[in-house]
UniProtKB/Swiss-Prot annotation:
Disulfide bonds: none annotated. SUPFAM superfamilies: S13-like H2TH domain. It comes from the Eukaryota. One of its GO terms (cellular component) is cytosolic small ribosomal subunit. Component of the small ribosomal subunit (SSU). Mature yeast ribosomes consist of a small (40S) and a large (60S) subunit. The 40S small subunit contains 1 molecule of ribosomal RNA (18S rRNA) and at least 33 different proteins. The large 60S subunit contains 3 rRNA molecules (25S, 5.8S and 5S rRNA) and at least 46 different proteins. It is found in: Cytoplasm; Nucleus. The keyword Oxidoreductase does not apply. One of its GO terms (biological process) is cytoplasmic translation. NCBIfam families: PRK04053.1. Component of the ribosome, a large ribonucleoprotein complex responsible for the synthesis of proteins in the cell. The small ribosomal subunit (SSU) binds messenger RNAs (mRNAs) and translates the encoded message by selecting cognate aminoacyl-transfer RNA (tRNA) molecules. The large subunit (LSU) contains the ribosomal catalytic site termed the peptidyl transferase center (PTC), which catalyzes the formation of peptide bonds, thereby polymerizing the amino acids delivered by tRNAs into a polypeptide chain. This is Small ribosomal subunit protein uS13B. Belongs to the universal ribosomal protein uS13 family. Keywords: Cytoplasm, Nucleus, Ribonucleoprotein, Ribosomal protein, RNA-binding, rRNA-binding.
């Protein structure tokens, strides 16, 4: 960032219903959007032909629109399906990129489905226990029973 701030510099921009810091470089600014990581932000910048050394506040409205269309429609811009965060969806079998509030809602739907069909993972989630095979004999004892009190 140069010492003199240009006139059209935006300190906070609105991208996909998220406030993004304009002082950060473009790639890292996009990671503030839920569902967009550094790798996905990198490939979006390359597909949109945007200089990586630019700050997010220096982007023109046309460049911002390009970024938004690429993020929302990755398959049209030849981003491979293995790069997306939702592959082979259980309902329609398609792959797509979940963004912002959709990430939370899809996760909640998945957990509800697991609980409904009573899989092992779903039951562990329902009982608030560890799901991924961790040992639970000594750790994770929050809030269950109180320890033994010593006599005086």
């Amino acid at each position: 960032m140069s010492l003199v701030v240009p006139d059209n510099f935006q300190h906070i921009l609105r991208l996909l219903n998220t406030n993004v810091d304009g002082k950060v470089k473009v790639m890292f600014a996009m990671t503030q959007i839920k569902g967009v990581g550094r790798r996905y932000a990198n490939i979006v910048c390359k597909k949109a032909d945007i200089d990586m050394s630019k700050r997010a506040g220096e982007l023109t409205t046309e460049e911002l629109e390009r970024i938004v269309t690429i993020i929302q429609n990755p398959s049209q811009f030849k981003i491979p399906s293995w790069f997306l965060n939702r592959q082979k969806d259980i309902n329609d079998g398609k792959s797509f990129q979940l963004l912002a509030n959709n990430v939370d809602s899809k996760l909640r739907e998945d957990l509800e489905r697991l609980k409904k069909i009573q899989t092992h993972r779903g039951l562990r989630h329902a009982l608030d226990l560890r799901v991924r095979g961790q040992h639970t004999k000594t750790t994770g004892r929050r809030g269950k029973t109180v320890g033994v009190s010593k006599k005086k």
